[in-house]
Each structure stands twice: as C-alpha cells, then as structure tokens.
Curated annotation (Swiss-Prot):
This is Augurin. The keyword Transcription regulation does not apply. One of its GO terms (cellular component) is cytoplasm. Transmembrane segments: none annotated. It comes from Xenopus tropicalis. It is found in: Secreted; Cytoplasm; Apical cell membrane. Probable hormone that may attenuate cell proliferation and induce senescence in the central nervous system. Pfam families: Augurin (PF15187). The gene is ecrg4.
C-alpha cells in the first residue's frame, strides 16, 4: 500500500506546476547561480557614491549684508533663530502651492490646539481653541 502511494505521488503531477517531488529534487541538484558581470569594480563604485555629499542648505545667504541686517532686526524684535527660520520658510513658500487655507494667507490648515483635525476644511472653526498666532 505504501509503495503504491509513493508511486502515485512520484509519477502523477501534483498541481499545474508538474510533479512536485521531481521539481524539489531538481532544485536541490541545481548549481549555484553565476555572479553577474559588472563593468565597474565595487571599490570604484563605492568611492564614487561616497563622494556625493549634499551641501547644507541655507534658506537665505547669510553672507549678504541686507540679509544680516534683516536677521539682526528680527532678533531685535524678540524672535529667536528658530522662529526666523520658520518665518523665512513660510514666506518663501507662499504662492508655490495652492493648497493653503484661505488662499495662502494663513500658514496652518486648521487650529493647532484642536485635538483632531478639521472635519471639513472649508468651514470656519470658531471657539476658544483658535490659534491667534496666525491672524
């Protein structure tokens, strides 16, 4: 009975892929895959990739005298450097995308103090949670 069972398993295809046992044996006997031929040596490629470094991006060139003057005036008005960078990035991105709330005048899409975002972005949000920094 066992011999008949093994004979059926070995000779009959088990699925649409053919005889599973034969496929397993062929897979075991297969040699190692050959290495792909690359035209550039590995150390040369790594040397090239490691030489590509992005320079640190400044929003505005601080070496220009008018930018230094604006920066000093900004600090004199009581803002810190992080606030300066935030405001610069905000004003420089004005008009780039049309997705701003109320046509690009307000920086935030909804009230920052709200525990959840707006259900409908086209409605006003009145109440005590309004963030007055944006007005």
């Amino acid at each position: 009975m066992v011999l008949l069972f093994l004979l059926v398993i070995f000779l009959c295809p088990g699925s649409t892929n053919g005889n599973k046992l034969r496929l397993m044996l062929q897979k075991r006997e297969a040699g190692e895959p050959s290495k792909t031929i690359v035209s550039v040596k590995e150390n040369k490629a790594n040397e090239f990739l490691n030489s590509l470094k992005r320079p640190k991006r400044q929003l505005w060139d601080r070496t220009r005298p008018e930018v230094q003057q604006w920066y000093q005036q900004f600090l004199y008005m009581g803002f810190d450097e992080q606030k300066y960078e935030d405001d610069l990035s905000y004003w420089m991105s004005q008009g780039r995308g049309g997705s701003e709330y109320y046509g690009g005048f307000h920086q935030h899409h909804y009230d920052e103090d709200a525990p959840i975002g707006p259900r409908n972005p086209y409605t006003f949000r009145h109440g005590a949670g309004v963030n007055y920094d944006d007005y």
